[in-house]
Curated annotation (Swiss-Prot):
Gene3D superfamilies per record: Globins
Similarity remark: Belongs to the globin family.
Domain Globin: 2-146
Tissue: Red blood cells.
Superkingdom of source: Eukaryota
Provenance organism: Struthio camelus (Common ostrich)
A Pfam family it matches: Globin
UniProt-recorded name of the protein: Hemoglobin subunit beta
Binding site for heme b: 63, 92
Cellular component terms (Gene Ontology): blood microparticle; haptoglobin-hemoglobin complex; hemoglobin complex
Gene giving rise to this polypeptide: HBB
Assembly: Heterotetramer of two alpha chains and two beta chains.
CDD domains xrefs: Hb-beta-like
Amino acid sequence: VQWSAEEKQLISGLWGKVNVADCGAEALARLLIVYPWTQRFFASFGNLSSPTAILGNPMVRAHGKKVLTSFGDAVKNLDNIKNTFAQLSELHCDKLHVDPENFRLLGDILIIVLAAHFTKEFTPECQAAWQKLVRVVAHALARKYH
């Protein structure tokens, strides 16, 4: 994947403002609420019975932060995303058996969260760069499935 200087700047510029804990928690919570079938991968997280329970669940919050922290690895390694996510792809495929479609869904949710948090900075150009990034990350995570 080729990244223009402008795309790199739009991605890293916005990333520098992201509160990883808050945005990660919100993104994962939204995934579990909007796409309830994804909850089956998080059975060990306890109470996921309602949006309120999900939003208040400390395990959802912690894992959301973990997910978005690893997303930061993509931002730091834009030219090597495939290798950056090789181990995570293996884990999600071989051990967790996560449907790779969920990576795309989470990417789309992250776009929504970023747009909600950064209304002024999240221009159409910024969205295009981030949409490309979440697509590349989802593809890298799904790589082990092919």
